[in-house]
C-alpha cells in the first residue's frame, strides 16, 4: 500500500516520499503519461507498469503487505498475497536510491501537460 511504499522510500533514500516523489516528473504520483523526464521518473514509470501487471492475487480493496528489513535489504513477506506488489514497491524504492545523484528538483510538482509523447508499458 501507499503507507508501506512510503516507508520503504524513506528508509532507502532518507527523503520524505510525498514532497520528493508525490508529483515528480510525468509518472510519480497518481496516473502517469508520456515519456519519463529522467531516471527517477523512469523508476515511477516501471513501478506503474509493474503494479499494473501484478495486481492478481492481491485484494484491490486492501493492498497492504508485510515486509521486513534484513541488514539493509527489504524482504517481502513470503506467504503474503500481495507479495508481488511489495516486490514492485521495493524495486522502485531501490531505484530511487540508486538515482539520488541525478534527482532534479525542477521536476518536483511537474505539470503533466509538459510531458511529451506517449510511452506504453
From Swiss-Prot:
SMART domains: PA2c. The active site is at residues 47, 89. The keyword NAD does not apply. Its cofactor is Ca(2+). GO terms for molecular function: calcium ion binding; calcium-dependent phospholipase A2 activity; phospholipid binding; toxin activity. Keywords: Antibiotic, Antimicrobial, Blood coagulation cascade inhibiting toxin, Calcium, Disulfide bond, Hemostasis impairing toxin, Hydrolase, Lipid degradation, Lipid metabolism, Metal-binding, Myotoxin, Secreted, Toxin. Binds 1 Ca(2+) ion. Expressed by the venom gland. It is an enzyme of class 3 (hydrolase). Disulfide bonds join 28-44, 43-95, 49-121, 50-88, 58-82, 76-86. It is found in: Secreted. It holds the Pfam family Phospholip_A2_1. Its main location: secreted. Its EC number is 3.1.1.4. Ca(2+) binds at residues 27, 29, 31, 48. It catalyses: a 1,2-diacyl-sn-glycero-3-phosphocholine + H2O = a 1-acyl-sn-glycero-3-phosphocholine + a fatty acid + H(+). One of its GO terms (cellular component) is extracellular region. Optimum pH is 8.0. Optimum temperature is 35-45 degrees Celsius. It comes from the Eukaryota. Belongs to the phospholipase A2 family. Group II subfamily. D49 sub-subfamily. PANTHER family: PHOSPHOLIPASE A2 FAMILY MEMBER, PHOSPHOLIPASE A2, MEMBRANE ASSOCIATED. Snake venom phospholipase A2 (PLA2) that exhibits myotoxin and anticoagulant activity. Displays edema-inducing activities in mouse paw. Also displays cytotoxic activity against some cell lines and myotubes, and antimicrobial activities against E.coli, C.albicans and Leishmania. PLA2 catalyzes the calcium-dependent hydrolysis of the 2-acyl groups in 3-sn-phosphoglycerides. Homodimer; non-covalently linked. This is Basic phospholipase A2 BbTX-III. It comes from Bothrops brazili (Brazil's lancehead). The lineage of its organism: Eukaryota, Metazoa, Chordata, Craniata, Vertebrata.
